[in-house]
Amino acid sequence: MNADNSESLLAETIKSLKKKDFSVYLNRWLRTLANHDNTTILAYFRDETPQILLADSETRAVHQNMSHVYLNGVYLLDPFYELHNSGADTNLYRMSDIAPDQFSRNQYFLEYYQRTTIIDEIAFIIWPSPQMSVHVCLGRDIRSKRRFTIRELSSAKQVLPIVETLVCEHWGNLRFSSEDHGENVLERMVRLVSETHGVQLTKRQ
């Protein structure tokens, strides 16, 4: 990590607050710390579809199925979404630490995650408001073919307070798009169970 470059990019990130290119500068700065291959920034709301704030990767497969598979309901099975759903504390989380036992055999992994080619992923979970969390996810995929080192994880962990401040300042007033009049979470879960298991549930169930 080049300390001077990191500080310079942090300054540029601060200058970009409230501007359209904020997420781009945030990503560039974080890359000097974690040297990640891909970035996904998502806003999760209560009972609504997540909103993509940034999707950046040189490996096409990472985000290829995000819009029509992940946002179509599979996100409900994402261990990171469960952190939102359970109101987890603001922190830096690693997928391999929070994923359920036999993660490589479960539905989320088989139907979506393995196709992204991501082999390691960490996420800053930030709460700009009680109803919304923003997840800044940094991943390693087949491009580098390696997991994050202890040093990289430590560097990312150290800047958590800065990331939290930046995210809350920039996206503190973000609201769910009123243009989406589709299913809510309950309706989406009923449909997902029906499609994957052939079981017809009612909303009451």
Stretches found by the model and what they are:
Residues 182-205:
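Helix-turn-helix DNA-binding segment
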Residues 3, 153, 183-187:
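Short, structured helix-loop boundary elements
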Residues 1-4, 198:
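Non-catalytic regulatory/interaction regions at protein termini and inter-domain linkers
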Residues 5-17, 21-142, 155, 161-171:
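Regulatory input/activation interfaces that engage signals or partners
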Residues 167-184:
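Short alpha-helical interdomain "coupling" segment at the junction between an upstream regulatory sensor module
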